[in-house]
């Protein structure tokens, strides 16, 4: 849940602030029984997290062709997690990931929209993130150019750099060789260059078609040394190995959108 406050400094300047919170509680227990129905625990997981999220943005219309938006998002994450896993059947549980505390993810951005003329418009800006858990940070430029050829058709080209942090359990993985030390605590953000083309066509007053081919180049992806494991193809709900930001990846495809407004 959350609450939102809006304050108009004047007809061209708006400050919008939102405070929200989320809570998650996950428990998982897996037990194997032998022929005599003697139990042998395989997995014991307890994970609780609370996020408090404060977002604020200042929207300003400079003139009919230029607007600017500056924003800040502060996410305070409280976590308490403990994952124990038996390496083999009938062996005792070992701690895989354990953490109890809090950390912050701070995001800020500044973006502008400029109507160059009646047919060309440009959006550009800069986004930044800081994870206080390990003081990793990133700066991400983004821009898009749109050409409105006529009242029905438009083309656009967009580029953006994006990054993401991992799930909290990844940072607190512990191994037998490192004891109580969290081996992934200093992981950097996973990053990506995103390039997209767009074709939009207004079929009728209430119907429109949009075709958007895109390609994504990912880098600094957390992977396990001398292994094919990557967080990009993670199919388990836990990670139990030390990771390094040495992976790369690529995504590409085409999005089709058919939109019809209901009267």
Predicted segments, located by residue:
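Face-selective signature of the C-terminal outer-membrane beta-barrel domain
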Residues: 1-134, 148, 210
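Residue-level signature of outer-membrane beta-barrel architecture
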Residues: 6-7, 56-60, 114, 128, ...
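Surface-exposed extracellular loop regions of Gram-negative outer-membrane beta-barrel proteins
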Residues: 25-27, 83-85, 132, 152-195, ...
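Outer membrane beta-barrel strand-and-loop segments of large Gram-negative receptors
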Residues: 51-55, 97-109, 184, 188, ...
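Extended non-membrane alpha-helical scaffolds
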Residues: 196, 201-205
């Amino acid at each position: 849940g959350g609450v939102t406050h809006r304050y108009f400094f004047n007809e061209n300047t708006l400050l919008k602030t939102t405070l929200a919170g989320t809570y998650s509680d996950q428990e998982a227990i897996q037990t194997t029984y032998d022929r005599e129905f003697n139990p042998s625990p395989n997995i014991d997981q307890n994970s609780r997290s609370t996020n408090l999220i404060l977002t604020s943005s200042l929207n300003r219309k400079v003139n009919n062709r230029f607007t600017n938006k500056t924003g800040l998002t502060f996410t305070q994450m409280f976590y308490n997690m403990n994952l124990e896993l038996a390496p083999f059947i009938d062996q005792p549980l070992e701690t895989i990931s354990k953490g109890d505390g809090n950390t912050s993810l701070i995001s800020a951005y500044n973006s502008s929209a400029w109507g160059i003329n009646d047919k060309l418009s440009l959006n550009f800006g800069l986004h930044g993130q800081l994870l206080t858990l390990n003081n990793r940070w990133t700066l991400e430029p983004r821009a898009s150019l749109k050409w409105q050829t006529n009242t029905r058709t438009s083309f656009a080209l967009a580029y953006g750099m994006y990054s993401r942090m991992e799930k909290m359990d990844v940072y607190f993985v512990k191994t037998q060789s490192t004891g109580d030390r969290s081996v992934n605590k200093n992981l950097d953000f996973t990053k990506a260059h995103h390039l997209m083309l767009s074709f939009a066509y207004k079929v009728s007053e209430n119907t429109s078609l949009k075709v958007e081919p895109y390609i994504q180049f990912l880098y600094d992806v957390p992977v396990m040394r001398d292994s094919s494991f990557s967080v990009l193809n993670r199919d388990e709900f836990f990670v139990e190995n030390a990771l390094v930001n040495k992976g790369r990846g690529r995504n590409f495809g085409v999005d089709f959108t058919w939109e019809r407004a209901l009267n």
